[in-house]
Amino acid sequence: MVLCLATACTAIGSVGYAQDSGSENKVTMADKTIHAQPSYVLSNSQVELAVTLLGGHMAPVTFYRDTSEPIQPYHISPWQEEKGPEMPAAVLVPLRGDFFCMPFGGNSEALGSEKHPPHGEVASSHWIRKVTERAGSVSHTSMTLETTARVGKVTKDIYLVDNQNVVYTKHTIEGFEGKVPLGHHATLAMSEQENSVHLASSPIRFGMTYPGVFSDPKQGEYQSLEPGKHWDSLAHVPVAWKGQKDADLSRLPARQGHADLVQIYNQPADAHQTPAWMTATFTDKGYVWFSLKDPSVLNSTVFWIENRGRHGYPWLGRNHCLGLEDVTAYFADGLKASVEPNAINQQGIKTALELTKKTPTEIRYIQGVVRVPQAFQVVKTIDFSPGQITLVSPDGLRVSAPVNHAFLSTGNPVRSN
């Protein structure tokens, strides 16, 4: 099995927002326990988010919290309140929402003497909050984690801006040397209504189904897509059964009882450095979830399409979610497969980033939610203007929202005049 993992709250203490002056290995006090996980909380009038101390998983996130119909788009794994056997991987303990992965993937094979847990220590070790603060229109929290499998330090900065239903995230990687696959593991809660979630992305080079066995029947897992197939459109992806029509991955959920993995590769950035984007339009709920990224940093999106297709522990045939995971990686195979020659990097497409001790690397990422009218069924394109994005449907409907997308190049969540 390839491991791609792809609100009741109980207060356990209210911490002040002073910096932690103790050891890097000290676990700071959480604000709340949320779905069984001690969590840090950041909020403003529009958005409230929680980040687990264990693994830095971000969920729940409540957008439009100042309205009568708030939106919580992220998945919380169904075993969070349960007591049971030890999890087969540490990342499964807090599994929820969006989390940073490095090295991204299962990491089942060591690279020389270097061995990492699934999705890396950053997805399953304790993050130490350093500060939560508010300056002007920006609410900000910062936390750090020191790694040992490959020695270094990662700082997670999360920003909320007043009057925006947007989360800005920056991960600063210091002290690391060499190539590594990395990225964000955004995991959305799926609707029960079949074909109600409509997916669209900025232009791609191509897409590919995972070339091996992603869901192994010997382990009570089942997949529906034919392995190792290239394709040009999410709407036409070959299935595993001969004589059957292609799957339309732009319309989900579908094919209940299966778990599949595919990857799409973004076109390189244009001369205007326009962000690459991914969208999921929840037509039954009236909103679009979106992500924005620099395609020269995160050049692909892995789709973890989980529709109750795994029956081993802790899945038990009940997990229903959609991972839209913006990464530079070779599927979810981890460090060794991503840095060595593979079917993707041999085509000139990077499957790992080169890190250096001399210069910190910043991974900047934007996620958010936009309410849309019922007639808005899917995103055809996104128009970018200073401090704003406009979602455009195939019918010409236009919905705008304030988003400081220049953050991807500047690292500043506030638009500069």
Give the label of every model feature segment.
Residues 2-12:
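Bacterial N-terminal signal peptides
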Residues 18-168, 179-417:
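Surface-exposed acidic/polar loop and edge beta-strand patches at domain peripheries
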Residues 172-176:
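Asparagine-centered strand-capping/turn motif at beta-strand->loop junctions
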